[in-house]
């Protein structure tokens, strides 16, 4: 029942929120967000397990599929859509499925989070296989749509993870690796778009970033698979070449063009003083890891 969930309780520090000054409201919200950061830090072992599941899925050709309803689903979508431009992934590699479909991005879809059959249909629609990993996101930890999605994923042999903001979450029962961030009562009672949402976003950032590092999408701390789809990103790509190799801006531009806009290929070309084809071959042999390709 909802009344037993910590995220649904009244926060003792904000019982008189309507009587506070603007500055006092901002201060208490900032303090509560600090608590969310601490709560996430206590779940690093569990988050690490999820990252390992995701890396394993990617290595066998599988996908990462986030499933959620409301704010949780939208946060999953936010993380998913940032992966192609940041890491050069195919849009299908990291996906998000929202209860209620695309309409739920901008408005509430009545009854969507309770539709267990829709969760199964939605996963079938994207062709879920045992090679994939499904991560269910639900602040309450009990959203029927998410529970159903994880249950179905386990039935077909896919790896599963979960992210909840309450202890003893139902979704944890269907997860190979379960994260339970105890964020506690919200500034606005029950409004889990606040602390719980902040905590979920931090965890999603960790999962996608650490997983991409684990499959060679990063060299040093540079986004070497960045897709330069606009002028800002093209300049960033060239700056990465300058910083990673020590070449001049003019040389960076030349190598960038010779490497067909592929930053990691250009890095190997510069540091190994080789042509495009040899650099590509080195990267292929190194499974995409720049550091290994340079050895």
Swiss-Prot record:
SIS domain location: 54-217
Active site (UniProt): 82 (proton donor), 113
Keyword vocabulary terms for this entry: Carbohydrate metabolism, Lyase
Pfam family for this entry, one: GKRP_SIS_N
Top EC class for this record: lyase
Recorded metabolic or biological pathway in which this protein acts: Amino-sugar metabolism; N-acetylmuramate degradation
Gene Ontology terms, MF aspect: carbohydrate derivative binding; carbon-oxygen lyase activity; ether hydrolase activity
The EC number(s) this enzyme carries: 4.2.1.126
Catalytic reaction annotation: N-acetyl-D-muramate 6-phosphate + H2O = N-acetyl-D-glucosamine 6-phosphate + (R)-lactate
GO BP terms: amino sugar catabolic process; N-acetylmuramic acid catabolic process; peptidoglycan turnover
Subunit note: Homodimer.
The family this protein is said to belong to: Belongs to the GCKR-like family. MurNAc-6-P etherase subfamily.
Family matches, as PANTHER family: GLUCOKINASE REGULATORY PROTEIN
Extra facts: A lyase-type mechanism (elimination/hydration) is suggested for the cleavage of the lactyl ether bond of MurNAc 6-phosphate, with the formation of an alpha,beta-unsaturated aldehyde intermediate with (E)-stereochemistry, followed by the syn addition of water to give product.
Alphabetical list of HAMAP family matching this protein: MurQ
NCBIfam families, sorted: N-acetylmuramic acid 6-phosphate etherase (TIGR00274), PRK05441.1 (NF003915), PRK12570.1 (NF009222)
Function: Specifically catalyzes the cleavage of the D-lactyl ether substituent of MurNAc 6-phosphate, producing GlcNAc 6-phosphate and D-lactate.
The protein's name in its UniProt record: N-acetylmuramic acid 6-phosphate etherase
Naturally occurring in which organism (per UniProt): Geobacillus thermodenitrificans (strain NG80-2)
Taxonomic lineage from the root: Bacteria, Bacillati, Bacillota, Bacilli, Bacillales
